[in-house]
Regions:
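Gly/Pro-rich cap/lid or specificity-loop segments adjacent to the active site
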Residues: 1-47, 54-81, 241, 260
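Active-site nucleophile elbow and catalytic-triad environment of alpha/beta-hydrolase enzymes
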Residues: 155-156, 171-190
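Acidic catalytic loop of the alpha/beta-hydrolase fold
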Residues: 159, 176-179, 204-209
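Short alpha-helix in the alpha/beta-hydrolase fold that links the catalytic acid
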Residues: 183-187, 210-220
Length: 260
């Protein structure tokens, strides 16, 4: 923080998806790039791709929006709030100033990641990968890690705390919560002026951002006579399907890219 001369903590300003896109535009200008042929993003990245088409329509030809939503539901906001509370109630969070105290809210951040990771998977994928498999031959009737799924979630949480900052996680979830471009008073003017071609992709087993959420964006674009293609890809991968190998998924993107 240039004003205090100390590391940013909880005093770092809350940012929005629009802020991120604006900063990316500054980087684009500094790199001397005149136009993006494609802006591609999944989940929160998909929201940024959509925002690019709204805020900088003259600088983007095509947007591929994957496993995203035009705004979060109450359920999604609730998941984010539980994750934030897990972090903020960790004593080592230190009011957000843990770096100055030479601490790290690892327990809270690990819990937040465990919760989030559950929402990224589908019930079917978890059943197929873990079921009710035990780590040992018999149930111990105690509170140790007994089921394989428990072990997996703890591993994901422990791994995450070594690669991600807790306050950044808080800011990221808030950016997700606040995203709602349709509520922008300038939305009609923005979407009316964009000439971007859109591809929306959703996945059948994604319950965090289900196909119906992508279809909301598709219907909005159609209502404004925009060029939009849409594919709902069959997958058991849940929300994380957008990160997984899937021939049909790749074919949809490849065809769109080759034709544009």
């Amino acid at each position: 923080n240039s004003e205090t001369g100390t590391n940013y903590g909880f005093d770092f300003p809350v940012v929005t998806v629009q802020d991120w896109v604006n900063s990316q535009k500054v980087l684009m200008d500094n790199l001397g790039i005149n136009k993006w042929q494609f802006v591609v993003g999944g989940s929160l990245g998909g929201m940024q791709a959509f925002q690019w088409a709204l805020d900088y329509p003259d600088y983007i030809d095509n947007a591929i929006i994957i496993a995203a939503a035009p705004k979060l539901t109450a359920q999604n906001i609730a998941f984010n709030e539980v994750a934030r509370q897990a972090i903020m109630n960790d004593p080592d969070w230190c009011g957000g100033n843990y770096l100055m105290e030479d601490k790290m809210p690892k327990r809270g951040l690990a819990l937040a990641r465990m919760l989030g990771h559950i929402t990224y998977l589908s019930d079917k994928s978890m059943a197929e990968k873990f079921g009710r498999d035990l780590k040992q031959e018999k149930i111990g009737f105690n509170f140790d890690v007994e089921f394989q799924i428990e072990s997996y979630l703890r591993y994901q949480g422990e791994k995450f705390v070594n690669s991600f900052d807790a306050n950044t996680y808080l800011l990221m979830t808030k950016a997700l919560d606040y995203y709602d471009p349709v509520s922008d008073s300038e939305f009609i003017d923005k979407i009316s002026s964009t000439t971007t071609k859109f591809l929306l992709i959703s996945f059948t087993s994604d319950w965090r951002f289900p196909p119906s959420r992508s279809e909301e964006i598709v219907k909005t674009l159609i209502s404004y006579n925009k060029s939009v293609s849409y594919a709902c890809v069959k997958s058991d991968g849940g929300h994380d399907a957008f990160l997984m190998k899937n021939d049909n998924y790749f074919d949809v993107m490849r065809n769109f890219i080759e034709n544009n």
